[in-house]
Amino acid sequence: MTKTKIMGILNVTPDSFSDGGKFNNVESAINRVKAMIDEGADIIDVGGVSTRPGHEMVSLEEEMNRVLPVVEAIVGFDVKISVDTFRSEVAEACLKLGVDMINDQWAGLYDHRMFQIVAKYDAEIILMHNGNGNRDEPVVEEMLTSLLAQAHQAKIAGIPSNKIWLDPGIGFAKTRNEEAEVMARLDELVATEYPVLLATSRKRFTKEMMGYDTTPVERDEVTAATTAYGIMKGVRAVRVHNVELNAKLAKGIDFLKENENARHNLS
């Protein structure tokens, strides 16, 4: 049975929109990682720069100081480690420590050395769709063009196709209607040769789904609904805060999909 990968979010920042300040010391980060592994995480995604609206850019030195001690403490755990960074210097420092994956929210567009660094260490990379919100074509067409172009550049740099993931970038450089369009047409991204990761957890899109004001934590059940929808559309991984809820849901949806496929094959 094909298992949907669960990526647990570990923000080692003081100002992330959902859990800023909770895990920005090594001891609390270690405890959170152990808990997420017990809850069913396949991948831990460590981030040292907040992406919340209005966040301040931190220096390279500050990002290194936030991320490296935590990565060093958890890299030996029995779980795949990803680092959420768009800086090749941070990526290389973490890859030297033994991380498996780089999650680049700018898909190599911010730092053109990113692909060669990831290729050098034979690691995986996630390419997330981003931008300034201005586009000359419909959002899904622009997303596909941009991501496939960057994936091609990653392959030229030496990263094999099976180590390149695509993320549609829900919550980044898109209007509410554009996010809804991307979600409705996820299968078009899934139809490419690359595995897709969906990252909606506790974001504005899930707040809009609720139809009334909520705190980030109150959006977990609706996040799980997007997990179920994404799996049915064919995504291969989800990036979430609430690992336990989404891992259980994904296991159930995976079973039902496998059951349906098996019965179709018998008919």
UniProtKB/Swiss-Prot annotation:
Provide any one GO MF term from the record.
metal ion binding
Q: What is its EC number?
A: 2.5.1.15
* Keywords for this protein: Folate biosynthesis, Magnesium, Metal-binding, Transferase
State how it assembles: Homodimer.
Binding locations of (7,8-dihydropterin-6-yl)methyl diphosphate: 51, 84, 103, 167, 203, 239-241
User: Which family, according to the similarity comment?
Assistant: Belongs to the DHPS family.
Catalytic reactions on record: (7,8-dihydropterin-6-yl)methyl diphosphate + 4-aminobenzoate = 7,8-dihydropteroate + diphosphate
Q: Which GO terms describe its cellular component?
A: cytosol
As for what it does, the entry says: Catalyzes the condensation of para-aminobenzoate (pABA) with 6-hydroxymethyl-7,8-dihydropterin diphosphate (DHPt-PP) to form 7,8-dihydropteroate (H2Pte), the immediate precursor of folate derivatives.
In Swiss-Prot or TrEMBL terms, this protein is called Dihydropteroate synthase
Pathway assignment: Cofactor biosynthesis; tetrahydrofolate biosynthesis; 7,8-dihydrofolate from 2-amino-4-hydroxy-6-hydroxymethyl-7,8-dihydropteridine diphosphate and 4-aminobenzoate: step 1/2
Q: Which PROSITE patterns match?
A: DHPS_1, DHPS_2, PTERIN_BINDING
Q: Which cofactor does it need?
A: Mg(2+)
- Domain Pterin-binding, chain residue ranges per copy: 1-251
Q: Provide the residue positions that the database annotates as binding Mg(2+).
A: 11
What species is given as this protein's source? Staphylococcus aureus (strain MW2)
Annotated gene? folP
By its UniProt entry, which Gene3D superfamilies does this protein fall under? Dihydropteroate synthase-like
Keyword Transferase appears in the UniProt entry: yes
Swiss-Prot/TrEMBL GO biological process terms: folic acid biosynthetic process; tetrahydrofolate biosynthetic process
